[in-house]
Amino acid sequence: MKIKIQKIHPNALIPKYQTDGSSGFDLHAVEEVMIKPHSVGLVKIGICLSLEVGYELQVRTRSGLALNHQVMVLNSPGTVDNDYRGEIKVILANLSDKDFKVQVGDRIAQGVVQKTYKAEFIECEQLDETSRGSGGFGSTGVSKA
């Protein structure tokens, strides 16, 4: 699949996969952003893109940022629809007790291209019964780890 990329900032970098087996590609910050402890920041990526119909871009947390800095993509996975043409931006949440400084060029998130499906919604009077029923949070048991 080919994805058209438009750089709209001089510091923007074209995404690339780090290894042949990578599912995700890195998204790089184009400006410095300071994210205070227990706060969120909006980080610009400096690119716009055009996805094929039937695909979305999921913006996900980088595991190293989560483990080492307690920084994550707040709405992970964030969805970039195939008809969106604006700048890609990432909402980062700093869950730590320290300031987190994003530098120009930092890899702050990863993108994964995913196939999407359109569902047809059919209104009905009653749903089929299941053994779970309407049991929600924790209804199938809690781990005793």
Curated annotation (Swiss-Prot):
Catalytic activity: dUTP + H2O = dUMP + diphosphate + H(+)
Residues binding substrate, per UniProt: R62, S63, G64, N75, T79, V80, D81, K89
Record key words, sorted: Hydrolase, Magnesium, Metal-binding, Nucleotide metabolism
A Pfam cross-reference name: dUTPase
Metabolic or biological pathway: Pyrimidine metabolism; dUMP biosynthesis; dUMP from dCTP (dUTP route): step 2/2
CDD domains documented for this protein: trimeric_dUTPase
Organism domain of life: Bacteria
Family that this chain belongs to: Belongs to the dUTPase family.
Name of the protein in its database record: Deoxyuridine 5'-triphosphate nucleotidohydrolase
Protein species of origin: Helicobacter pylori (strain ATCC 700392 / 26695)
